[in-house]
Structure formats: C-alpha cells, structure tokens
C-alpha cells in the first residue's frame, strides 16, 4: 500500500521556505525514506517527499537514482536517503540539482 510519507516524517511550516519535511524521530545516516521522483519517458513525477523537501547548500539528504525496467519500458526513480544522522524535529533538506538533467 502506498503511503505519501513514512510514519516518521511530517509536513509543517519551514524556516527555509514555505512548507518542509520534518522528522518525528531520529533518523540514522543511510536511511532510505522512499521515492521522491520518478521519470517515465520525458515526464517527471514528484511524490510528497520530492514536493516538500527544501533546498540547502549543506543538505542532510541526497537523491539516489535507480534504473527500473518492466515488460513495456525502462524508467528512472529517485529515492531520498539520509546523508547524516538527523535529529527528531529537524527539517530534511536536499541540494536542488534534479532539474539539471
């Protein structure tokens, strides 16, 4: 069953910009929080993880690209992974480079 966000994340007002993703518990480095974007042919779809994470020059998360295949076509998806230990209550951030593809 698809869940828009893992149970340990929430969306709330950000000091960075608008709304952001925040932790409800400590997250350890390397934690895969799920899919943030998917690209099928030339169209990019953003999940709530990709839509609410804010930019930072020194982020605590990164995108990990995965090439997927099925019987009809290949597609790419990106998962959001913690690059540092993140404390409860902290905002998740990412370096915005996705649309430089």
For the regions a language model picked out, list residue spans one by one:
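Conserved catalytic SET/PR domain of SAM-dependent protein methyltransferases, capturing the structural core
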Residues: 1-101
């Amino acid at each position: 069953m698809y869940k828009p966000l893992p149970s340990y994340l929430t969306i709330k007002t950000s000091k960075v910009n608008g709304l952001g993703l925040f932790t409800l518990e400590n997250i350890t480095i390397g934690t895969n929080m799920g899919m943030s974007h998917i690209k099928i042919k030339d169209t990019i779809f953003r999940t709530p993880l990709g839509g609410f994470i804010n930019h930072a020059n020194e982020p605590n998360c990164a995108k990990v690209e995965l090439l997927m295949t099925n019987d009809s076509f290949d597609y790419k998806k990106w998962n959001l992974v913690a690059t540092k230990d993140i404390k409860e209550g902290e905002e998740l951030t990412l370096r915005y480079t996705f649309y430089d593809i």
